[in-house]
């Protein structure tokens, strides 16, 4: 991938960086509305003097490789639509924590906190972290497995729904 625009779209912010000639640019953060998503990408691409042929979008939501329906916004990101409207060779969509899993090997060891010392029997990894929701991804036998685990109803939430208490200020679920 020669030149690419990299996007991380969360429930609150959009972050972007450019990958130009094997160099990652400074990451910028901004708040945008759903309706401004494609115009914002178009503006970013037009501001660059280099030709940008690739777009990588990481977003919170189920990814079928063609589109992502965000779990925390009223937005569906469609790869083919972005390729056409932004005149791109390729748009790659990733679940947000799938993107984190891809970046894991780029992090320095000092970025990690060891909770319990031990001798791992393999390199399988479970990644969990907060964002707009709870992000979860797995790496099993060097294969990245994105999940929507953070969007699964807990038994407590289900019980509150069943008893019609989910809207009550007296009860909440963690």
Residue map of PLM features:
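Short beta-strand-loop/turn "lid" adjacent to the catalytic site in phosphate-handling enzymes
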Residues: 49-93, 98, 102-110, 127
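A glycine- and small-aliphatic-rich helix-loop capping segment at beta-alpha/alpha-beta transitions
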Residues: 21, 73-76, 107-115, 141-147
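Glycine/GP-enriched mid-protein hinge/lid loop-to-helix segment characteristic of carbohydrate kinases
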Residues: 115-174
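Two-metal-ion RNase H-like nuclease active-site motif
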Residues: 2-8, 125-130
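Short, acidic Gly/Pro/Ser/Thr-rich loop/turn segments
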Residues: 14, 62-64, 133-137
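Short glycine-rich, Thr/Ser-proximal phosphate-binding strand/loop in the N-terminal lobe
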Residues: 3-45, 144-158
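Glycine-rich phosphate-binding loop signature in dinucleotide/nucleotide-binding domains
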Residues: 47-51, 119-122
């Amino acid at each position: 991938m020669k030149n690419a625009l990299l996007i991380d779209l969360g429930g609150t912010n959009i972050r972007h960086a450019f990958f130009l000639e094997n160099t990652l640019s400074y990451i910028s953060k901004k708040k945008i509305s759903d309706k401004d998503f494609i115009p914002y990408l178009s503006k970013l691409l037009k501001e660059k003097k280099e030709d940008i042929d690739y777009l990588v979008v990481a977003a919170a939501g189920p990814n079928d490789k063609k589109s992502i329906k965000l779990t925390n916004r009223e937005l569906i990101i469609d790869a083919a639509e972005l390729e056409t409207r932004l005149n791109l060779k390729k748009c790659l969509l990733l679940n947000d924590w799938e993107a984190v899993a891809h970046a894991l090997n780029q992090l320095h060891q000092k970025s990690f906190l060891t909770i319990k010392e031990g001798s791992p029997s393999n390199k399988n990894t479970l990644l969990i972290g907060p964002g707009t929701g709870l992000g979860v991804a797995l790496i099993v036998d060097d294969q990245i497995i994105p999940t929507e685990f953070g969007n699964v109803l807990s038994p407590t939430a289900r019980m509150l729904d069943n008893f019609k208490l989910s809207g009550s200020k007296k009860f909440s679920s963690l």
